[in-house]
């Protein structure tokens, strides 16, 4: 392993995963010196709130349940939650749901650790470095990995602080639902992109790389299960939780930034753009970092295929293996188009997307971003 001259890594996230993982929450609350959590739930009525409450059984731990976090919560919602937290004597926060619920929980944690105004007055996207309350996250639907990360979006503002990461992520198969059509595939590709781009980044973090390898292997080893969507939920949830840790300790790569820029410039969804762009961006990065690309073949293809591939061919095999994995994860129903052109992205929109992505310091210049987009538009390997 090549060690950089300087790197940093931070993660407070403990993961409890598997059958009856929910029943460990009262124990973890006690370890955090918390006695009454406020549990935030989405507006869906799918039985997850009842399953969650039942897991507390005879633990003697009271919970305050708030059902109905809206799809786009605002500061009025935050003040309502802050008042409920204060009036009911809560001392911890649990997010039960997906990305919106996790973001609301992070915003509330900033507010209850100080005042609601602290969130509105936060500058530079970074909340005050106060010690926040215990925060647990229990996924029920596929997210994008940001749920366990240091990032949050609330009230059309973005926030970033390592203190926003949950203290505990609880992955219990009883709670997991597939969500909207295409959501599971989008979640798995998002986790894969975070991991792959962290492994190919110019300043590679060896600890982030270890987490990234686990994310990739979880997805690769369960690619067959992805065709039976319910069987893929637990591996995907674990991969997403770990990818949030990777995301917090890495810089988003060109595929992620170009996909976001392209979705802002054209009607294509960010998830579809990312699925098309990732192999092309990975091939581009492989030319810059061939040794890292060769190493990346190991988690993508597995030990047997890696050892059978001659050392001099491993870097070149990485991007095709990545493309194959994305197709396997998507399955026939969610398979992405073969190219941006096939996805009806106007070719004339590519320069604007490249400019937008370059402004966000993607590590690829405007010209390099346009090269990646052009290859993805034609579908050239």
Predicted regions and their residues:
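C-terminal charged capping/lid subdomain of soluble metabolic enzymes
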Residues: 300-381
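C-terminal catalytic subdomain
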Residues: 250-323
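Flexible, glycine/charged-enriched surface loops at secondary-structure junctions
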Residues: 202-211, 225-235, 250-255, 308-312, ...
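Short alpha-helical scaffolding segments that buttress acidic/His motifs in well-ordered protein cores
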Residues: 192-196, 236-244, 259, 278, ...
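Glycine/threonine-rich beta-strand-loop-alpha-helix active-site module
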Residues: 76-174
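ATP/NTP phosphate-donor binding region
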Residues: 1-92
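Carboxylate- and glycine-rich phosphate/diphosphate-binding segment that chelates Mg2+/Mn2+
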Residues: 151-250
């Amino acid at each position: 392993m090549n060690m950089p001259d300087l790197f940093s890594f931070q993660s407070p996230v403990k993961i409890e995963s598997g059958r009856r993982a929910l029943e460990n929450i009262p124990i973890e609350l006690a370890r955090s010196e918390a006695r009454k959590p406020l549990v935030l739930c989405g507006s869906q009525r799918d039985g997850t709130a009842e399953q969650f409450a039942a897991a507390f059984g005879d633990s003697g731990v009271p919970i305050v349940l708030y059902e109905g976090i809206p799809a786009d919560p605002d500061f009025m919602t935050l003040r309502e939650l802050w008042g409920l937290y204060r009036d009911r004597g809560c001392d911890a926060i649990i997010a039960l749901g997906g990305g919106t619920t996790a973001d609301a929980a992070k915003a509330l944690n900033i507010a209850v650790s100080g005042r609601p105004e602290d969130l509105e007055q936060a500058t530079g996207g970074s909340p005050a470095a106060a010690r926040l309350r215990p925060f647990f996250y229990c996924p029920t639907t596929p997210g994008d990995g940001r749920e366990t990360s240091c990032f949050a979006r609330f009230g059309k503002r973005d926030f970033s602080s390592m203190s926003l990461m949950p203290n505990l992520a609880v992955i219990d198969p009883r709670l997991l639902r597939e969500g909207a059509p295409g959501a599971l595939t989008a979640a798995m590709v998002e986790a894969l992109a975070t991991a792959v781009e962290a492994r190919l980044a110019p300043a590679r973090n060896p600890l982030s790389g270890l987490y990234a390898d686990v994310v990739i292997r979880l997805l690769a080893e369960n690619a067959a299960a992805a065709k039976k969507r319910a069987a893929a939920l637990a591996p995907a949830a674990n991969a997403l939780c770990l990818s949030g840790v990777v995301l917090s300790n890495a810089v988003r790569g060109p595929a992620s930034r170009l996909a976001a820029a392209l979705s802002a410039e054209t009607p294509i969804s960010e998830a579809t753009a990312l699925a098309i762009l990732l192999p092309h961006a990975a091939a581009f990065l492989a030319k810059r970092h061939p040794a890292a690309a060769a190493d990346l073949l190991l988690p993508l293809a597995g030990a047997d295929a890696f050892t059978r591939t001659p050392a001099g061919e491993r870097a070149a095999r990485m991007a095709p293996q990545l493309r194959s994995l994305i197709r396997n994860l998507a399955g026939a129903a969610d398979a992405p188009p073969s190219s941006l052109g096939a996805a009806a992205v106007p070719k004339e929109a590519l320069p604007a997307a490249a400019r937008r992505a370059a402004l966000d310091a993607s590590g690829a210049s405007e010209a390099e971003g346009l090269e990646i987009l052009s290859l993805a538009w034609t579908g050239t390997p």
